């Protein structure tokens, strides 16, 4: 049985019903509609912590989806799963693919920055100061891009940029 037919909570059921109605009235081709069903099922599985099932659905959606913007969100969600599973390199790969298709996605830019910052922290803990600084600089560049797109978000990142002297631009109010 498809995941969308076994949702147990009210919000998931409501979302599924609304998505089905939208799919029926939107002038989308069958392939795009099928891609959306896989994407929707992937999101549902991801929300339930069923990451393997979510990835299966996202990969199927990627095979069908042609719109670059929609593909960017699928890739972004795949990145989130890999990050949640501790595979930062794989997460970076998918976040970067997402940003390549949609450079105006601050959440992906932020997540890239978070990974570089984390890697910088690890390098510093291991006494690799130069590498840590290079990773922090990478994190700063991605956070600046995210903040330019969403200046009211990422307050902790804005503060970190200021405290570390990496905020030479005036996007922070």
From Swiss-Prot:
Essential for the assembly of the photosystem I (PSI) complex. May act as a chaperone-like factor to guide the assembly of the PSI subunits. GO terms for biological process: photosynthesis. GO terms for cellular component: plasma membrane-derived thylakoid membrane. It comes from the Bacteria. TPR repeats lie at residues 35-68, 72-105, 120-153. Belongs to the Ycf3 family. Keywords: Membrane, Photosynthesis, Repeat, Thylakoid, TPR repeat. NCBIfam families: PRK02603.1. Coiled coil: none annotated. The keyword Thylakoid applies. PROSITE patterns: TPR, TPR_REGION. Gene3D superfamilies: Tetratricopeptide repeat domain. InterPro entries: PSI_Ycf3_assembly, TPR-like_helical_dom_sf, TPR_rpt, Ycf3/AcsC/BcsC/TPR_MFPF. Signal peptide: none annotated. It is found in: Cellular thylakoid membrane. This is Photosystem I assembly protein Ycf3. It is a peripheral membrane protein.
